């Protein structure tokens, strides 16, 4: 399996619950390295641009409102099969359908406030990482 990078966002609901460290620990215990990270308060423009592919969906306005309701932690994770591994750790989008022990099963309350975001493909990972980080902000982890 190839070493990949993926974007992960700890959403406002999880930040407010003060579980950032617990979520990051799960990534690291699963063999993923954090190679870039920052806490940001997204503007409506930034959140809308990030989720532009959903612009015509009925939930778009609520999604943007939620993502701007408090700070988020945005990070780049790196590791073998990072995209699939991160999605497995997150669990199903709807926390009621998420496997026990996944991030969403443990920390999310609804399909709307579901604790985390993760890239779903190599193409989306590349696009999403570039949306939040300059190449110089992503640090190779060689030790």
From Swiss-Prot:
Q: What class of enzyme is it?
A: transferase
**Which GO molecular function annotations are given, in alphabetical order?**
ATP binding; metal ion binding; nucleoside diphosphate kinase activity
- Which of this chain's residues are annotated to bind ATP? 11, 59, 87, 93, 104, 114
Q: Which cofactor does it need?
A: Mg(2+)
| InterPro entries, sorted | NDK-like_dom, NDK-like_dom_sf, Nucleoside_diP_kinase, Nucleoside_diP_kinase_AS
Keywords from the named record: ATP-binding, Cytoplasm, Kinase, Magnesium, Metal-binding, Nucleotide metabolism, Nucleotide-binding, Phosphoprotein, Transferase
Q: What domain of life does the UniProt record list for this protein's source?
A: Bacteria
Please give the Gene3D superfamilies that the UniProt record associates with this protein.
Nucleoside diphosphate kinase-like domain (3.30.70.141)
A GO cellular-component term linked to this record: cytoplasm
Which reactions appear under catalytic activity for this entry?
a 2'-deoxyribonucleoside 5'-diphosphate + ATP = a 2'-deoxyribonucleoside 5'-triphosphate + ADP; a ribonucleoside 5'-diphosphate + ATP = a ribonucleoside 5'-triphosphate + ADP
Under which EC number(s) is this enzyme classified? 2.7.4.6
Question: What residues sit in the active site?
Answer: 117
One GO biological process from the UniProt record? CTP biosynthetic process
Quote the subcellular location field of this record.
Cytoplasm
Q: What does this protein do?
A: Major role in the synthesis of nucleoside triphosphates other than ATP. The ATP gamma phosphate is transferred to the NDP beta phosphate via a ping-pong mechanism, using a phosphorylated active-site intermediate.
PANTHER family, per the entry: NUCLEOSIDE DIPHOSPHATE KINASE, NUCLEOSIDE DIPHOSPHATE KINASE DDB_G0292928-RELATED
Q: Per the similarity annotation, which family is this?
A: Belongs to the NDK family.
Q: How does it assemble?
A: Homotetramer.
Q: What is this protein called?
A: Nucleoside diphosphate kinase
Q: Which species is listed as the source?
A: Azotobacter vinelandii (strain DJ / ATCC BAA-1303)
Gene from which this protein is expressed: ndk
């Amino acid at each position: 399996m190839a070493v990949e990078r993926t974007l992960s966002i700890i959403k406002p609901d999880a930040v407010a619950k003060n579980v950032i460290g617990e979520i990051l620990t799960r990534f690291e215990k699963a063999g993923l390295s954090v190679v870039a990270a920052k806490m940001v308060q997204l503007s409506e423009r930034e959140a809308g641009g990030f989720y532009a592919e959903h612009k015509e969906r009925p939930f778009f306005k609520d999604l943007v409102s939620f993502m701007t309701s408090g700070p988020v932690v945005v990070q780049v994770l790196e590791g073998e099969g990072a995209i699939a591994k991160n999605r497995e750790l997150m669990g199903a989008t709807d926390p009621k359908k998420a496997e026990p022990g996944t991030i969403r099963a443990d920390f999310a309350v609804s399909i709307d406030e579901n604790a985390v975001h993760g890239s779903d493909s190599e193409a989306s990972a590349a696009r999403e990482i570039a949306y939040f980080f300059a190449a110089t902000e992503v640090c190779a982890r060689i030790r």
